[in-house]
């Protein structure tokens, strides 16, 4: 695995993890949309979400992370891409949530992040 692929994996984790809390914030209020039947409910929820830039912009950025993910998947072994990108997504989601004031991270959260980084480092170094 070369440096470019490592950067791609970091980028996927950063994009996915960084946008998850923003998508959550942008989707606030969708549960208040109430319609009489199932199909109308789905349509109105879709319209509600996609007409709000606070949801749409982070979602589109998040989807661009999927493009980077699939590109990286074509270049790197799947046994590395999936666990590394998912682990880094968790890490960046936690950090972004903390930056946005969603929750205060405790010792166990930081310890978990250290373990994630150690695991990612082991996975990456095993392929050099």
From Swiss-Prot:
Location(s), subcellular: Membrane
| Predominant location category | membrane
TM spans (from-to): 3-23, 53-73, 80-100, 104-124
What membrane topology was assigned to this protein in its record? Multi-pass membrane protein
* Gene Ontology cellular component list: membrane
Q: Is Repeat among the key words of this record? A: no
The record's InterPro entries line, in alphabetical order, gives: TMEM234
Keyword Transmembrane helix appears in the UniProt entry: yes
Q: Which domain of life is it from?
A: Eukaryota
User: Which UniProt keywords are present, listed alphabetically?
Assistant: Membrane, Transmembrane, Transmembrane helix
Q: Which effects follow disruption of this gene?
A: No visible phenotype.
The record's family statement is: Belongs to the TMEM234 family.
- This protein is called Transmembrane protein 234 homolog
Q: Which organism is it from?
A: Dictyostelium discoideum (Social amoeba)
